[in-house]
Amino acid sequence: MWTSKTISFTLFITTTLLGSCNASAKAKTQPLFPAILIFGDSTVDTGNNNYPSQTIFRAKHVPYGIDLPNHSPNGRFSNGKIFSDIIATKLNIKQFVPPFLQPNLTDQEIVTGVCFASAGAGYDDQTSLTTQAIRVSEQPNMFKSYIARLKSIVGDKKAMKIINNALVVVSAGPNDFILNYYEVPSWRRMYPSISDYQDFVLSRLNNFVKELYSLGCRKILVGGLPPMGCLPIQMTAQFRNVLRFCLEQENRDSVLYNQKLQKLLPQTQASLTGSKILYSDVYDPMMEMLQNPSKYGFKETTRGCCGTGFLETSFMCNAYSSMCQNRSEFLFFDSIHPSEATYNYIGNVLDTKIRGWLKA
């Protein structure tokens, strides 16, 4: 028979357990950063290129976005989510990161962060002049407008606290090589050594990080280069490469650049009081998937899912292009950009690294 003491004790235990469960659930869903701020190129551009009229690098047409919830293209260069969205989701910040140039952004979207990246952009201004993208060096101007809007919503003090604690993602660099240095003879004459050009690009990157710091950014994730020689479009560029193997020299270029970047970032952090700068390795995860595709569910790694997969990207990947049905089995969606499945794996690797970085 239940006594009043038994009932009271049972209620106490139940309430305690429920409270503990709720606290645990809340801890798991709490965002690790108050906001996410993203700068760079098409690997992280969530749609800013929908708005400048002069650029040809757009993804606001099918089949881009075919695996998004509404199956609708919105400027992301993949079949679904890209790295920006995936890392924001994993860190419990938001499901999708909106582009800053999107009209009618809500206050909540501003407070939790936006994307300033532009497809076709590079650290080298010459790269963006060729592609008509929003130059990386211009993206802080959008950021300044964002800061003004954020301050109008939450006030100056809270706005700077959000920016100081936001995760800032910087992802650019490949365009400087595949759309510029490798393709423009005059640029190679100015920088006869690839190492010299890498140093120039890295100096631009370093100045960019310092500018973000001057605007209040403190926690900055900086991406390295992927294995550029394994991008389908680069393999296609070598007409004799009938067997479609990775271009080892371009991969060596990526490795050298990444080694220099990993040496540079700790020096930059040491010069910027209170900063935490993390190198984001995309080369090794990509090579792991390329070398062990079946382990990750991939069956095709040398061409994209869109069209022939050898050359199509941006406007060449369109409604008239043939489309693979098994998109999760393709490492690349078009001839340059990874599929959502690939971004997911890279996101998992970096999520683990970021969480460890926060504890350090």
Swiss-Prot record:
One of its GO terms (biological process) is lipid catabolic process. This is GDSL esterase/lipase At1g58430. Belongs to the 'GDSL' lipolytic enzyme family. It comes from Arabidopsis thaliana (Mouse-ear cress). The keyword Hydrolase applies. Glycans are attached at residues 22, 104, 326. Gene3D superfamilies: SGNH hydrolase. GO terms for molecular function: hydrolase activity, acting on ester bonds. It is an enzyme of class 3 (hydrolase). It comes from the Eukaryota. The active site is at 42 (nucleophile), 334, 337. The lineage of its organism: Eukaryota, Viridiplantae, Streptophyta, Embryophyta, Tracheophyta.
